[in-house]
Every structure is written in C-alpha cells, then in structure tokens.
Amino acid sequence: MTITRAEMASILDYTLLGPEVTTADLQALIDDALTLGVPTICIPPSMMNATKRAQDAGLRIATVAGFPHGKSAPLVKAAEARLAVQYGASEVDVVLDIAAVKAADDNALLAEMVAIREALASPVTLKFIVESAVVDDVALEVATHAARAAGADFIKTSTGFHPAGGATVEAVRVLAGAAQGQIGVKASGGIRTWEQAVAMVEAGATRIGTSNARAILEGAPA
C-alpha cells in the first residue's frame, strides 16, 4: 500500500492525555497540529475550556470518557462525554467496561454503548475502546459487532495506558474484519514511527491515535 504524508496526516489524532499535561502543553500541541496538517487533537475533558483557539483554527477536538480504566457507570461516561461536547468536542473516545469486553458479554456491551450513543447524537463521532492487548480475538469481534449495532463510528484498540500494551497489527486486522467497513478502526497505543503507522493502515486502521505525530510524519519517505 502506498500512502502519502498528507494522507497519513489526515487520519492522525494527535494525542495529549497524560495526567500531568498543562495548558502550555496544549497550546504547543495546537501549534504543532496546525504546522503538520493534522486535523484532530485528542485531549483530556478537563482541558476542553482551553480549546477556543484550536476550534477557531478549524481543528477537530476529540476527548475521552471513562478514561483510562472504563470503570465508570455508563451514565457517568455519557454525562462526561455530553459535557465535553457542550464545550466543543466533536469526537469522544469512550473506554468500555473491559471486563465485559473480555467476557464477550454482548448484552452488557450493547447496553453500555447504546446509553452513550443516545447521549451523543450525530454528528458527534463516537469511538469505543476495547484494550485489545488483554482481549482475545473472539471478544474483539463481539465488541465490534456490538459497536456496529449501537451506532458507533469507530472501534478503537487501546487507551495507551494499559500495562499490557497498545495496538498490534494482529488486533487491528481482527477489528477491521469484524467492522466490515461499516465503522472505522482506530489504532492507538505505542505507534511512534512512520513504518508502524503504515503497518496499522495496511491492517485496516482508518484512524491512528498517537502522541508522536511529528516523528511519524517526519519519517515519511521523501
């Protein structure tokens, strides 16, 4: 697969989700995203009130809910996400109950997903995170099918904060197979180089979450 630097930039979510990030870090991220041509930044919900400059510049603002462990009640996640949208978020990445994902409990997953989707009407882009590093292939497929049924826009591999690791080519391939092109697949967690990003796209990722957007794009072939 041949992918250009501009095409890669267009599918990156430039991520800043560490617990110690500051408003100055956010402003630097905004500057870098604009310079690199990356259209989306992903930031903590508590920083949504500092995104006016990014919104005015045309950046899409993504945030997270139930992050990073997914153990909030679904209605709490929904409220967190809805508040972020009121502050200007156009995309929300929600961590599912990972125990339910691992158990392939489609009823529990669908109930959670529907509650959150109902709180975030279109055109808000909704992504569900499954922590693929700790989930087997069958459970990944079940979660993806539930996400499709619930009206999600993306299934996402990882928070990037789980000690088991982040995205793998193998997990992306499973998610993409289950998604069947009906929803997107976001690969996130540990993607630091151009080669890694290309491998994820080749496996079926349609979005890449990374805090290393500059390094990835600077690694593009001349």
Swiss-Prot record:
Entry annotated with the keyword tRNA processing: no
One Pfam family recorded for the sequence: DeoC
The organism's taxonomic lineage, starting at the top: Bacteria, Bacillati, Actinomycetota, Actinomycetes, Mycobacteriales
Keywords: Cytoplasm, Lyase, Schiff base
UniProt function note: Catalyzes a reversible aldol reaction between acetaldehyde and D-glyceraldehyde 3-phosphate to generate 2-deoxy-D-ribose 5-phosphate.
Any GO molecular function: deoxyribose-phosphate aldolase activity
GO biological process, one term: 2-deoxyribose 1-phosphate catabolic process
Top-rank lineage group of the source organism: Bacteria
Active site per UniProt: 93 (proton donor/acceptor), 156 (schiff-base intermediate with acetaldehyde), 186 (proton donor/acceptor)
EC numbers on record: 4.1.2.4
GO cellular component: cytoplasm
UniProt cross-references to SUPFAM superfamilies, sorted A to Z: Aldolase
Annotated protein name in UniProt: Deoxyribose-phosphate aldolase
Protein location: Cytoplasm
InterPro entries per UniProt: Aldolase_TIM (IPR013785), DeoC (IPR011343), DeoC/FbaB/LacD_aldolase (IPR002915), DeoC_typeI (IPR028581)
Pathway stated in the Swiss-Prot or TrEMBL entry: Carbohydrate degradation; 2-deoxy-D-ribose 1-phosphate degradation; D-glyceraldehyde 3-phosphate and acetaldehyde from 2-deoxy-alpha-D-ribose 1-phosphate: step 2/2
Naturally occurring in which organism (per UniProt): Corynebacterium efficiens (strain DSM 44549 / YS-314 / AJ 12310 / JCM 11189 / NBRC 100395)
Catalytic activity of the protein: 2-deoxy-D-ribose 5-phosphate = D-glyceraldehyde 3-phosphate + acetaldehyde
Gene3D superfamilies: Aldolase class I
Annotated family: Belongs to the DeoC/FbaB aldolase family. DeoC type 1 subfamily.
